[in-house]
């Protein structure tokens, strides 16, 4: 949508070298001149006069040849050949015209630094100059003082890239806290600065509600709202109202009362949440997506046109002309199939598979996702192309978690994620209309609410009241349990599904056989040289992983059409690769230190429970959620690339390896505790209420015919 980002491109600097031959030739020419008949040596003083420059030149050459040279910087991870520009996904390129400061390091270190623990100083040994064989013997001269030899610089201490990322995250977090608004006037000023328009009517009531609930108010926390709503400034307000009212699953708000006809359990949970703030809401209709999968993918070209209109609408209207009240709406429509009074746009719902063909139309035309060919078969081993990850990585580790979840610059993900290969259900449209949902991909156009399981606080997603013991009392390093979801896996496509890939990477037997060359990996890759893993050098990767990993499927979620059908969670086409294990309640999992979180059919509903626990979440995801702008990667959680190529490197950093690589257990504990404390401060149910109230005030303004004149300006006139 709109702008583009730059790819990190590969460049090599030529190291300038002094050539001894050229300088020696100069010395020979000088000496030959001194021997010629035109310059006979009449007196010793004359001889000294000409010999001294020769010794001076030789001394300079000797000095220069012994200087330490800059270390060469190997390019261990980046590859060239991609476009120099990084196209952004349609849903992120118009993000309020402001950068996402939460997940980006303030100054990302260049991605072409030396690999971890590698011998990369690259300095050549000094070369002693030797006189040429035809150099004439010179008369004896007084001994000249020796030229000082510069000492070779000591090899710098290797800093692990994760240390750099954590340092950057700490700074980003402090910068974020510095933006806190402590008064209503400060909050309104921050709003105008970041959004380019006046706050919506009711902003003062929103602020009062937030302060009553002890909320930390930082304008950046609400970026996702404007990311979601801004394209709708390109639609007529009347169209927005009609499309919302005419949808089949709707929450209606009239005269401060919220209601819904649907008894679908997600609808009822969202209704319960909205009813807690209904007295502060204007009239509106809220259309809901009841599916796991998102449904709106408006072409990038259309979104760009809508965003152009949105940008033109950003004005700070004179205070005297501001409309301070929302309009009243007629009673909600009754959803009768025979009622044709509501003329809504035909959505032309699509069921195209693979879903990649739908999802990528939200990417810019020049993006790799649009330009690279689409896959037609998923039967072979997945293709892992680490070079596509370089825009969001630093030395192989995620440096921009927001960009990592975008896929427009990562065309290989079409064969590495179940949602792109074969979702459980596909029903998508190109038509932009106001549909609310709990999560979405980077190119989807839903308006995000906190997911139902976050509000409902069901124990299987939260772990209950027990958030785990103290770090020092935990019983094991890594645990993951889950069902083999991600989409509809079958005999010809399961190898690319993300959960299948991750579980295989934790199979010590598979790893050992792959290391020995006995059995090539079926659906994963051994780690590349970027990570310089000590266990891999020792050919003990499988043995090492077996010491700390407790990972397995509880159900293989087999294709329902396959024959013969198996019981107990087994599956005929994956049984030779996986054995099911007993499930563990989240409260039990919190007794482990590290909790990988892998996407299922959509986002992982356990993530908020993980953040609130005393354990450390290791998060890999393609899905956007309401809270993304509130979390700082490497400060509150550990981000992981969706290929999982950095997984072993992450674990080596935290756990160490025997005596050769030190661990960072204290760093892991600090991130876990910081994440827990932060979640308890900004991801509470009260914070969900505050977020939704702000969201719905903005939504009501966009659906009002007088929207460009509406706002809250009391701070400017008082």
PLM feature spans:
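Asparagine/serine/threonine-enriched low-complexity, disordered tracts
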Residues: 85, 95-98, 103, 108, ...
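Eukaryotic basic, amphipathic alpha-helical target segments in cytosolic regions
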Residues: 65-68, 195, 199, 211-214, ...
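Acidic, Ser/Thr-rich intrinsically disordered and amphipathic helical segments
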Residues: 56-59, 183-190, 202, 497, ...
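Catalytic binding pocket for nucleotide-activated donors in carbohydrate/polymer assembly enzymes
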Residues: 583-716
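Short interface patches used for recognition in eukaryotic signaling and trafficking proteins
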Residues: 41-42, 169-174, 185-189, 484-488, ...
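Compositionally biased, intrinsically disordered low-complexity segments enriched
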Residues: 130-152
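N-terminal signal-anchor transmembrane helix specifying type II single-pass membrane topology
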Residues: 2-89, 95
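Secretory-pathway glycan-assembly enzymes, especially type II membrane glycosyltransferases
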Residues: 45-55, 63, 115-118, 122, ...
């Amino acid at each position: 949508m709109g702008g583009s980002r730059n790819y990190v491109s590969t460049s090599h600097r030529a190291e300038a070298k002094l050539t001894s031959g050229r300088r020696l030739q100069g010395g020979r020419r000088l000496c030959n001149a001194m021997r010629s008949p035109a310059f006979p040596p009449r007196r010793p003083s004359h001889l000294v006069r000409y010999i001294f420059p020769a010794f001076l030149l030789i001394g300079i050459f000797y000095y220069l040849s012994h200087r330490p040279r800059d270390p060469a910087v190997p390019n261990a991870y980046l590859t060239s050949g991609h476009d120099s520009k990084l196209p952004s996904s349609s849903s992120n390129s118009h993000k309020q015209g402001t950068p996402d400061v939460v997940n980006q390091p303030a100054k990302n270190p260049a991605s072409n630094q030396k690999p971890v623990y590698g011998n990369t100083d690259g300095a050549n040994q000094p070369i002693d100059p030797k006189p040429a064989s035809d150099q004439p013997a010179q008369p004896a001269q007084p001994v000249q003082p020796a030229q000082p030899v510069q000492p070779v610089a000591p090899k710098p201490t290797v800093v692990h890239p994760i240390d750099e990322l954590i340092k950057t995250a700490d700074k980003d977090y402090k910068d974020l806290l510095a933006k806190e608004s402590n008064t209503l006037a400060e909050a309104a000023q921050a709003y105008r600065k970041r959004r380019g328009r006046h706050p919506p009517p009711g902003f003062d009531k929103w602020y009062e509600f937030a302060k009553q609930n002890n909320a930390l108010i930082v304008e950046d926390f609400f970026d996702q709202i404007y990311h979601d709503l801004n394209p709708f400034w390109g639609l007529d307000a009347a169209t927005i109202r009609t499309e919302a009212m005419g949808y089949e699953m709707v929450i209606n708000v009239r005269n401060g009362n919220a209601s819904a006809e649907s008894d679908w359990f997600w609808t009822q949970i969202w209704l319960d949440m909205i009813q807690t703030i209904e007295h502060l809401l204007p009239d509106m209709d809220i259309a809901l997506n009841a599916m796991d999968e998102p449904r709106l993918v408006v072409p990038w070209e259309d979104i760009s046109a809508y965003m152009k209109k949105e940008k033109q609408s950003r004005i700070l209207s004179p205070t005297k002309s501001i409309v301070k009240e929302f309009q009243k709406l007629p009673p909600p429509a009754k959803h009768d199939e025979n009622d044709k009074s509501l003329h809504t746009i035909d959505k032309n719902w699509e069921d195209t598979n693979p879903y990649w063909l739908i999802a990528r139309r939200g990417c810019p035309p020049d993006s790799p996702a649009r330009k690279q060919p689409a896959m037609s078969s998923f039967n072979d081993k997945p293709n892992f192309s680490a070079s596509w990850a370089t825009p969001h990585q630093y030395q192989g580790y995620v440096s921009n978690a927001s960009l990592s979840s975008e896929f427009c610059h990562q065309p290989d993900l079409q064969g590495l994620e179940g949602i792109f290969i074969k979702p459980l259900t596909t029903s998508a449209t190109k038509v932009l209309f106001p549909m609310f949902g709990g999560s979405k991909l980077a190119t989807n156009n839903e308006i995000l609410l906190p997911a139902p399981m976050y509000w409902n606080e069901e124990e299987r997603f939260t772990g209950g009241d027990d958030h785990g013991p103290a770090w020092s009392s935990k019983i094991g390093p890594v645990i993951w349990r889950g069902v083999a979801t991600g989409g509809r896996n079958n005999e010809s496509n399961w190898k690319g599904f993300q959960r299948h890939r991750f579980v295989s990477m934790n199979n010590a037997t598979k790893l050992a056989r792959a290391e020995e060359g006995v059995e090539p990996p079926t659906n994963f890759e051994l780690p590349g040289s970027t990570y310089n893993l000590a266990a891999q050098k020792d050919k003990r990767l499988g043995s090492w992983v077996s010491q700390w990993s407790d990972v397995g499927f509880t159900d293989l979620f087999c294709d329902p059409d396959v024959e013969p059908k198996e019981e107990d969670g087994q599956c005929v086409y994956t049984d030779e690769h996986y054995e099911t294990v007993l499930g563990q309640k989240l409260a039990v999992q919190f007794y482990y230190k590290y909790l990988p979180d892998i996407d299922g059919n959509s986002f992982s509903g356990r993530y908020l429970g993980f953040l609130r626990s005393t354990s450390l979440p290791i998060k890999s995801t393609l899905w956007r959620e309401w809270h993304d702008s509130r979390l700082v990667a490497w400060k509150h959680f550990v981000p992981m690339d969706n290929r999982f190529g950095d997984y072993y490197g992450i674990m080596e950093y935290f756990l160490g390896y025997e005596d050769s690589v030190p661990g960072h257990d204290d760093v892991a504990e600090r991130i876990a505790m910081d994440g827990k404390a932060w979640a308890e401060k900004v991801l509470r149910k009260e914070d969900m209420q505050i977020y939704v109230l702000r969201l719905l005030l903005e939504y009501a303004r966009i659906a009002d015919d007088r929207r460009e004149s509406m706002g809250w300006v009391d701070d400017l006139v008082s």
